[in-house]
């Protein structure tokens, strides 16, 4: 059986870059990894494969939506460190439900008999306020991970995601493994002071702290994971450390996880407003 992770966070938070680097860290520690991009932008696997790969929707359109005519090679690309990537894709902008495609992608992998051949499956999911469609990966996940930055909008989105995880945990096995603090800046952004307080309030922890660093942005534009960058890059080890830390925790015998206790929508405005 595969260990399934669902990675969520506010749009533009660095979720796909973080997901790709977590996948790379896991793969370099010996895990066979599948990363599934669950965003109509279909750029989740770009740092792994170095290109915008064909989406499940595009592949299905080519065979007039006859699932049985597709093989794994039609929808899965292998990239850095042997990581397999799949992009669910979505309908044209302004039409249809992007979340519906996520469930269809999982069904297709199961029909092909490849869903359970991986050690780790990582869903990289669009999710500011989680609708029913984009919450579908939580139905399959062992653990959810939230990517957040040290600001109110990000924390508000993280709290909404905690609500979705709590709701899903009633019927499914999913638990929250923790929050990854992204773009941590102790000189201008307050470090993780607000995230530390939020994590304690909802009953979770910070899995790791990813620094705000030009090298991370540079790797994304290069279409690479950090692990594929020139090993002589200054401060590379500092940037890699949090992803290795996350991978070690995920691959441990029993990762620490819990069902979060989210704050009410109106209450969070009062609570967070008092944090410094």
From Swiss-Prot:
CDD domains: Bchl-like. Its EC number is 1.3.7.7. Pathway: Porphyrin-containing compound metabolism; bacteriochlorophyll biosynthesis (light-independent). It comes from the Bacteria. Belongs to the NifH/BchL/ChlL family. Homodimer. Protochlorophyllide reductase is composed of three subunits; BchL, BchN and BchB. This is Light-independent protochlorophyllide reductase iron-sulfur ATP-binding protein. It comes from Chlorobaculum tepidum (strain ATCC 49652 / DSM 12025 / NBRC 103806 / TLS). The gene is bchL.
């Amino acid at each position: 059986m595969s260990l399934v992770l669902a990675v969520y966070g506010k749009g533009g938070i660095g979720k796909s870059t973080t997901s790709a680097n977590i996948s790379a860290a896991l793969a370099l520690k010996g895990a066979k990894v599948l990363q599934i991009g669950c965003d109509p932008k279909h750029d989740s696997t770009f740092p792994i494969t170095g290109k915008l790969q064909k989406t499940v929707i595009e592949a299905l359109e080519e065979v007039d939506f006859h699932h049985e005519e597709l093989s794994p090679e039609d929808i899965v690309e292998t990239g850095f460190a042997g990581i397999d990537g799949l992009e669910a894709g979505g309908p044209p902008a302004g039409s249809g439900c992007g979340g519906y495609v996520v469930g269809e992608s999982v069904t297709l992998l199961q029909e092909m008999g490849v869903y359970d051949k991986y050690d780790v499956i990582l869903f990289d999911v669009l999710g500011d306020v989680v609708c029913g469609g984009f919450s579908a990966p939580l139905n399959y996940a062992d653990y959810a991970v939230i990517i957040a930055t040290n600001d109110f909008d990000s924390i508000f989105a993280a709290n909404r995601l905690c609500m979705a995880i709590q709701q899903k945990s009633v019927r499914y096995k999913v638990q929250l493994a923790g929050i990854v603090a992204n773009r941590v800046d102790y000189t201008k952004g307050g470090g993780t002071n607000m995230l530390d307080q939020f994590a304690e309030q909802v009953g979770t922890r910070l899995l790791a702290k990813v620094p705000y660093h030009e090298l991370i942005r540079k790797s994304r534009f290069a279409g690479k994971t950090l692990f594929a960058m020139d090993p002589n890059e200054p401060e590379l080890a500092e940037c890699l450390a949090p992803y290795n830390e996350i991978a070690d925790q995920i691959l441990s015998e029993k990762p620490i996880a819990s069902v979060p206790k989210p704050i009410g929508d109106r209450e969070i405005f009062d609570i967070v407003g008092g944090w410094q």
